[in-house]
């Protein structure tokens, strides 16, 4: 067990030396294309999305409303919260609420009645400016008052729920306050709702609200504050160890920085749409991984090259059991390229031997799509280093679990009469069974 762990730790260091930084948009497109099963359209779409929002920007995916794939770029800050009542819409044809030069009230608590915000509402009526109210919740009594005044034409107003929950909601509200130059009203902030005046209001150049989402475009007057906030969030991102938390912090940075790219996946049928969404999701994850840790030429060829480093690592081990663990890793690293070759209908051992004879050519490898040996970096057959690293680390983690388990229950597959065994399966002739 410890032999496998030590071997993989050393191989990860070797992998980092073999990795190349993603330098061009074409490299990103190639990574996405390979991960999407060779779909060049998906690769180009993801490459274009990253070109618009930057390498560290946020690219999301959603179901499109047409049969064609589309790339939509949203300026400003967008989040998944829509208007609380359809009576707030200003454009009945498109069912959206849209205001320019809008004031924003940010409340980190529930608004129970209109009396809670009477001072703010009176200021909006006197100033004749549109008002967006963003709160944890606007309860029925307060909502009814706002709707009646909107329908009468007394107030240009719209209310939405604040994005997020708990601490994350408070952070989002702070982000919006910094973008718009406002102040968050709440007990924890030291500003009570009853005493709040128009001094706490933020300003947006434009707001667009649909049934499902809200977009706020700042007026640019708070650029310095936004830059400082982004720097602060980046520091938090560097300190956290959780991938989910890091991803959410990255989303906040992208929203504050002024843009999110949305890939709208289109298809003719529901079945095609599900399959296509999985391909796009895989391609997006692979592209992010490539930006994070670089790329290597062909994952199978890279693993085979790493297998040649194992003997050096093994010689530094004194424990025979650890050396056995290193041997297991070496044999395992040879399997992927054989399986790739077999799936392409060629002899895996022949392909492996050809690559092994050219270890001095770091980018040389087998392209299963064209059944040829070539420079994989030049032809775009590249894989994210992070994917290769995680595959090794996760494989060892699973193997450790099996070694420590008393018993493993699995389904016994019946081999049909006359069926040929998998030539790269553990226990096949020439591959030292027992792995």
From Swiss-Prot:
Q: What induces it?
A: By heat shock.
> What are the recorded GO MF terms, alphabetically?
ATP binding; ATP-dependent protein folding chaperone
Question: Where located?
Answer: Plastid, Chloroplast
A biological process from GO? protein refolding
Keyword Nucleotidyltransferase appears in the UniProt entry: no
Query: Any additional notes?
Result: This protein shows ATPase activity.
The UniProt similarity line reads: Belongs to the chaperonin (HSP60) family.
- What function does this protein fulfil? This protein binds RuBisCO small and large subunits and is implicated in the assembly of the enzyme oligomer.
User: What binding partners and quaternary form does the record give?
Assistant: Oligomer of probably six alpha and six beta subunits.
Q: What is this protein called?
A: RuBisCO large subunit-binding protein subunit beta-1
């Amino acid at each position: 067990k410890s032999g496998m762990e030590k071997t993989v730790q050393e191989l990860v260091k070797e992998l980092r030396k073999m990795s190349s930084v993603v330098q061009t948009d074409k490299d990103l497109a190639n990574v996405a294309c390979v991960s999407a099963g060779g779909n060049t359209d998906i690769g180009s779409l993801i490459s274009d999305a990253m070109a618009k929002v930057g390498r560290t920007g946020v690219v999301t995916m959603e179901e499109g409303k047409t049969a064609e794939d589309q790339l939509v770029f949203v300026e400003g800050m967008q989040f998944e919260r829509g208007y609380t009542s359809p009576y707030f819409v200003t454009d009945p044809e498109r069912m959206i609420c849209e205001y320019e030069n809008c004031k924003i009230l940010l409340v980190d608590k529930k608004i129970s009645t209109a009396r809670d915000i009477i001072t703010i509402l009176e200021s909006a009526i006197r100033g004749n400016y549109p008002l967006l109210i963003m709160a944890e919740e606007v309860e029925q009594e307060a909502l009814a008052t706002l709707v009646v005044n909107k329908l009468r034409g007394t107030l240009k107003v719209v209310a939405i729920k604040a994005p997020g929950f708990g601490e994350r909601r408070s952070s989002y509200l702070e982000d919006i306050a910094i973008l718009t130059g406002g102040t968050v009203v709440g007990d924890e902030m030291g500003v009570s709702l009853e005493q709040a005046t128009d001094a706490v209001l933020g300003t947006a150049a434009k707001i667009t609200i649909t049934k499902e989402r809200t977009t706020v475009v700042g007026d640019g007057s708070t650029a310095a504050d936004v830059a400082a906030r982004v720097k602060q969030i980046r520091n938090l991102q560097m300190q956290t160890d959780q991938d989910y938390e890091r991803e959410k912090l990255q989303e906040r940075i992208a929203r504050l920085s002024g843009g999110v790219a949305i890939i709208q996946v289109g298809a003719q049928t529901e079945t095609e749409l599900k399959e296509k969404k999985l391909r796009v999701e895989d391609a997006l994850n692979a592209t992010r991984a490539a930006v994070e840790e670089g790329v290597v030429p062909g994952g199978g060829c890279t693993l085979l090259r790493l297998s040649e480093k194992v003997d050096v690592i093994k010689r530094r081990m004194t424990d025979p059991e650890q050396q056995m663990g290193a041997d297991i890793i070496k044999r395992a690293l040879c399997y992927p390229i054989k399986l790739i070759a077999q799936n392409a209908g060629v002899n895996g051992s022949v392909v492996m031997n050809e690559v092994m004879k050219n270890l001095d050519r770091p980018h040389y490898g087998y392209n299963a799509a064209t059944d040829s040996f070539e420079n994989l970096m030049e032809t775009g057959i590249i894989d994210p280093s992070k994917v290769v690293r995680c595959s090794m680390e996760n494989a060892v983690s699973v193997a450790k679990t099996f070694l420590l388990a008393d018993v493993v229950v699995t389904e016994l597959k019946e081999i049909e009469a006359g069926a040929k065994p998998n030539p790269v399966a553990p226990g096949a002739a020439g591959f030292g069974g027992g792995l």
